[in-house]
Amino acid sequence: AMACCAWTMPAVAANAAPAAPAPADGPPLVLPNFAALARRNGPAVVNISVTREVAQVGIELPPGIAPDSPLAPYFARRVIGNREEVSLGSGFIVDADGIILTNRHVVGDAATVDVKLTDKRQFKGRVIGSDPLSDVAVIRIDAHGLPAVATGDPARTEVGDWVMAIGSPYGFANTVTQGIVSAKSRSLPGEAYIPFIQTDVPINPGNSGGPLFDLQGRVIAINSTIYSKTGGYQGLSFAIPIDIALDVKDQLLRNGRVTRGRLGVALQELDATLARSFGLASADGAIVTMVAPNGPGARAGLAPGDVVLSVNGRGVADSADLLDTVARIRPGRQAELAVWRAGRALRVTVEVGALDR
């Protein structure tokens, strides 16, 4: 229901002095200059057009028999063919000699990859490699002296920080959008090993693979996915931290594949209530709920009910943080875990295994 609200100015004595302005709590708010950021970083963002061969099934009829003819079901013949499907995405140059990062789902199963720069030059792209777990792919184009982005440290980004995205939503190249970091270390269904950065930056189909910048113009993440009931932007956007993407890039360029470490345990989040029941002062950490037989954790002596507090001296915030930290350790190397068990602190040394995925 609508309500009409009228505000009446209170009577003031004719000679009354004007009220003094309330003191400011701090310096005036200055909004960031997104125009300068976009101007400086736009040339390193690319538009990616991908062609795929998609199988399709059709029905073929002999000449003279219409599809609605009663004879059609008896003479129809199933035929299988291919059709071309074109999709669009974004990417960004990380090396002046033609190395580009994007999402795997942008270039997966591509027959051809066409890359267009902001100066309207176009190149054929070659997919060097991709990683299903992180959804990161590396493309190379035959060009040199290209504008490349600078990269930052996602760990230094805080909730509430301004961020900016550049990409090609629905093919509209070099579209600039902005917002803030809404949350960090988000774990999405089926993506437990990636601690996503959540933002409210408007992201739509075609933005995938584009960069997320901080206010210093450094890329801190790759825009990857949205949560939506409509298929379009609804305020929930998720990006892959750039340090994870760069590690994937380096491994793909060096080895052609990506390896990750694993503990061989199932984990549960630790909340304030559980932390108190365990006798812990903080809810930081991850609870071990299951240990795979003969896995790295089992061989090291980890047990259900253990709370992992740190890895190699680095504190664990939650289960996604623990999985990410261990994934970055090369298989075969040792890691020292700080573990809380039955009210006392332990040190557990584990030889990190290899993640099969």
Model-found features: residue ranges?
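Conserved catalytic motifs of ABC-family nucleotide-binding domains
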Residues: 305
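Short strand-turn-strand beta-turns centered on an Asx-Gly dipeptide
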Residues: 311-316
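Serine-dependent protease modules
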Residues: 14-284, 289-296, 300, 319-323, ...
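C-terminal segment of classical bacterial N-terminal signal peptides
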Residues: 2-12
